Amino acid sequence: MHCSLNGDWSMQLNSTEISDLIKQRIESFEVVSEARNEGTIVSVSDGIIRIHGLADVMQGEMIELPGGRYALALNLERDSVGAVVMGPYADLKEGMKVTGTGRILEVPVGPELLGRVVNTLGEPIDGKGPIEAKLTSPVEVIAPGVIDRKSVDQPVQTGYKSVDSMIPIGRGQRELVIGDRQTGKTAMAIDAIINQKNSGIFSIYVAIGQKASTIANVVRKLEEHGALANTIVVVASASESAALQYLAPYAGCAMGEYFRDRGEDALIVYDDLSKQAVAYRQISLLLKRPPGREAFPGDVFYLHSRLLERAARVNEEYVERFTNGEVKGKTGSLTALPIIETQAGDVSAFVPTNVISITDGQIFLQTELFNAGVRPAVDPGISVSRVGGSAQTKIIKKLSGGIRTALAAYRELAAFAQFSSDLDEATKKQLDHGQKVTELMKQKQYAPMSVFDQALVIFAAERGYLDDVELNKVLDFEAALLSYARGQYAELAAEIDKSGAYNDEIEAQLKKLTDDFKATQTW
């Protein structure tokens, strides 16, 4: 090898010298270990931390912070990681060391959580001691595929006449409850949970961004009505960080999936997803993701679709495969009742339209109806159930066919009747019937009705037994009829509650019951 230096002299290097030089270099080389799952906080602001050095972190990974807290990795950038702190962040400082755990966020699941109030991470906040859950589950799970699903054909009774007759809900369905503030959305969901206390359906109530006093009231009501024992309450109140409010629905869903995947039935209420979307928008803007319509990030549709797709009815093969053959021949279901709050009845805003398009129907609650004393304030005109019809109890399905038609005709005629004074007999009769059906659909809170009670009341309305009852006496008539039936026809009531069947014999018995009651004139 020939090297020319300064052009005036040259030196020769032989192969031995070269190999010695290389050996020398190798011996003097220092190995500096680079911790790929350890990083340093470079900035802290508004619950968002930027971390330098976490090379091997995954999307959604738990990052351990000083003091036993965690952050969630959401932005994986070229030279830094953006993570959102779950919990208080005031004492975090630049330069602090953090560690990647290699785990996605998991929450405890199982029957041990029933009857308890927990936070987003599954930690008890009801002061009743620790929860000895044996299993945990990731909060983000891919929803069951098409092959694993089964069609919806079993009912979830809400206990509301208006819902069970016109907008029936099936096990594994997603039914949106939508309306302005103070229209009875939470009341409807809580009543649906109370009605499941003897149905074998487990319930999960997820409170997102609500006042702590409101949540305490809900828990007390569930306890008073004996429904807390088979309910899990997941709380991310208004005072919690945006990260916990964003994650709460997924945590609640993971707890519900435990029952679904083992051949049980569960009902989950998200109260409400508008607040979750706002929390997610806050996180996204702080992470400097580009805003879109109404300043929401581009993936706000996916935020809700991946959550609501996990509510499903799964078939026997899926359950058997999931439980390794322990549970055979049983289907499982998770029914979702997401709640969305609208502003001044605007259902065409971004988040409401998204959730309407994801769900299998919606129950629309109207402020005008609520203020007029029609409670629950269900608007039968724009409320639908896209898959619940095949899940409806046979007797309710047979009897309630005319209810929606009667109310639709009544609404049309009522608008017309305002401008016309001389109405013919048929129109007057239709208006009168519509008014009485509207009156009959009213129901008090915390008073869910059994299948028999609903069937009997609808039977009386449909067969003209209310025609000679004054409008202001309709609810008295209903109460007296039910009390009479429970006393005199207890066997029939038990049979209908159990089977939900409808045939000529049952029809004859209902007719005899109502005729006997009308003869007493005791309302």
From Swiss-Prot:
Function: Produces ATP from ADP in the presence of a proton gradient across the membrane. The alpha chain is a regulatory subunit.
Regions annotated as coiled coil: none
Xref: InterPro entries: ATP_synth_asu-like_sf, ATP_synth_asu_C, ATP_synth_asu_C_sf, ATP_synth_F1_a_nt-bd_dom, ATP_synth_F1_asu, ATPase_a/bsu_AS, ATPase_F1/V1/A1_a/bsu_N, ATPase_F1/V1/A1_a/bsu_N_sf
EC number(s) given by UniProt: 7.1.2.2
Membrane topology designation: Peripheral membrane protein
Family listed: Belongs to the ATPase alpha/beta chains family.
Keyword Kinase: no
GO MF term list: ADP binding; ATP binding; proton-transporting ATP synthase activity, rotational mechanism
Disulfide bonds, paired cysteine numbers: none
Organism: Vibrio parahaemolyticus serotype O3:K6 (strain RIMD 2210633)
Annotated site, Required for activity, chain positions: S383
Location, primary (coarse class): membrane
Lineage: superkingdom: Bacteria
Keyword Cell membrane annotated: yes
Alphabetical list of Pfam families matching this protein: ATP-synt_ab, ATP-synt_ab_C, ATP-synt_ab_N
Name the record gives this protein: ATP synthase subunit alpha
Gene3D superfamilies in the record: 2.40.30.20, ATP synthase alpha/beta chain, C-terminal domain, P-loop containing nucleotide triphosphate hydrolases
A cellular component term, taken from the record's GO annotations: plasma membrane
Complex and partners: F-type ATPases have 2 components, CF(1) - the catalytic core - and CF(0) - the membrane proton channel. CF(1) has five subunits: alpha(3), beta(3), gamma(1), delta(1), epsilon(1). CF(0) has three main subunits: a(1), b(2) and c(9-12). The alpha and beta chains form an alternating ring which encloses part of the gamma chain. CF(1) is attached to CF(0) by a central stalk formed by the gamma and epsilon chains, while a peripheral stalk is formed by the delta and b chains.
Binding site for ATP: G179, D180, R181, Q182, T183, G184, K185, T186
